[in-house]
């Protein structure tokens, strides 16, 4: 948590746990209850448990807290309506998900502490933020939840597989022994990690830099695999829903090298990954932007939207700026704190047909993305060798999202990575 936010909750004298965060997520007063209305509502951040270890650890811990347990979570616990409601209430305060906690740290460094009130992240990311990313504003402090937490290991294993011969296994043992012999507390701390045994961490893994070296005092137990699977299934149904507009370049250059056909397959896969409660719309742009489909719930509109995607064909110029501006305006008009609002734009070339300037577009994006985490985020894909990757990265930065680079061979994977935010 940003240190002032933690102190407002009584830290370090009073413990903070999942029960604290759940209570704040349910409160309508937000930080005004603690004399800080300028901090806005309580907003929580965690990564996607299907993509990220920290997100999975956080989600399991939430279910354990809801069930009042530290270990031994059962299928009945996960499926209990009371426990589902507890986790759902916390998830409704999420600003967005994602595949790495580093994105949260980068956004907090760029946009300030009101971007998110608390984030489930590894201690190493807290230290990285305080010692590398922070350029001003409060530091982050690592808080071990009073209910308990997990250690995240980085295991080294030698697969028991036909392609691992005796020489390979012997070489792996040499590497393993060398790593173990060299992994002193000092070496681990250089990368902001704790030592691999019970030895206490050393600087810079210390309280002066935001770490919690005397924690954790309680550890949680991971449930068995079938319970983990049930947690993921429940999270999919209960996570904060998204409202996304997909903007697709259909200019004449998209006919080259089968780019449009590959992009359509990427969009198809993206739409199929979203949950029934999510809403997705589609717009295309060439000489001018055109709305193909307003956002519709995937529960009822998925098949119809997929059919519209497959009916697209390329022609004309590239009105990238106008398309992005108008898509963001449409989503912003509907935006609220009940959904993750975003625009995903793919383009293979430079803008040559827009009325709005690049500079004005950036201003508009900063206005709707804002410094608080509940704005509209813009994700961009620079598609193919002719794309303006740097320009699209600037658009994503202004829009509080992330920039990606892809081609016909990788575009499906790019859309999968973007789906982690929802």
Tell me what each language-model feature is.
Residues 1-52, 60, 64:
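A conserved helix-loop-strand patch within extracytoplasmic ligand-binding domains
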Residues 8-10, 53-55, 128-130, 254-257, ...:
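Extracytoplasmic/secreted cell-surface and envelope-processing proteins
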Residues 61-144:
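Ligand-binding pocket segment of bilobal, Venus flytrap-like solute-binding proteins
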Residues 194-246, 250-261, 290-291, 296-300, ...:
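Acidic, polar low-complexity linker/tail segments
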Residues 239-297, 313, 320-328, 339-347, ...:
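Von Willebrand factor
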């Amino acid at each position: 948590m940003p240190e002032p936010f933690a102190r407002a909750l009584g830290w370090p004298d009073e413990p903070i746990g999942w029960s604290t965060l759940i209570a704040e997520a349910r409160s309508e007063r937000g930080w005004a209850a603690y004399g800080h209305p300028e901090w806005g509502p309580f907003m929580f951040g965690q990564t996607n448990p299907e993509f990220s270890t920290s997100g999975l650890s956080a989600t399991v811990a939430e279910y354990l807290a809801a069930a009042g347990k530290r270990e031994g979570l059962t299928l009945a616990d996960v499926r209990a309506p009371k426990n589902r409601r507890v986790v759902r209430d916390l998830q409704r305060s999420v600003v967005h998900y994602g595949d790495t906690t580093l994105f949260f740290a980068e956004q907090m460094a760029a946009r300030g502490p009101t971007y998110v009130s608390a984030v489930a992240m590894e201690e190493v990311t807290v230290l990285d933020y305080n010692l590398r990313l922070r350029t001003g504003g409060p530091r982050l402090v690592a808080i071990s939840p009073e209910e308990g937490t997990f250690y995240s290991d980085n295991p080294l294993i030698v697969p028991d597989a036909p392609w691992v011969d005796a020489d390979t296994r012997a070489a792996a043992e040499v590497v393993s022994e060398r790593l173990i012999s060299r992994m002193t507390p000092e070496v681990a701390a250089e990368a902001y990690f704790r030592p691999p045994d019970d030895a206490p961490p050393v600087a810079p893994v210390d309280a002066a830099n935001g770490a919690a070296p005397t924690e954790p005092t309680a550890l949680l137990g991971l449930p068995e695999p079938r319970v983990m699977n049930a947690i993921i299934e429940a999270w999919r149904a209960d996570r904060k829903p998204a409202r996304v507009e997909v903007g697709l370049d259909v200019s004449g250059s998209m006919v080259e090298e089968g780019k449009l056909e590959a992009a359509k397959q990427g969009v198809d896969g993206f739409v199929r990954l979203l949950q029934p409660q999510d809403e997705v719309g589609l717009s295309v742009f060439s000489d001018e932007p055109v709305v193909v489909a307003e956002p519709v719930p995937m529960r009822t509109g998925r098949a119809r939207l997929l059919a519209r995607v497959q009916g697209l064909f390329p022609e004309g110029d590239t009105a990238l700026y106008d398309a992005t501006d108008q898509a963001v305006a449409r989503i912003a008009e509907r935006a609220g704190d009940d959904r993750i609002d975003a625009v995903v734009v793919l383009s293979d070339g430079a803008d040559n047909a827009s009325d709005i300037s690049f500079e004005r577009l950036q201003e508009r994006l900063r206005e709707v993305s804002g410094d608080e985490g509940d704005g509209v985020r813009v994700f961009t894909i620079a598609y193919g060798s002719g794309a303006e990757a740097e320009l699209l990265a600037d658009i994503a930065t202004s829009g509080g999202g992330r920039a990606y680079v892809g081609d016909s061979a990788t575009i499906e994977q790019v859309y999968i990575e973007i789906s982690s935010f929802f």
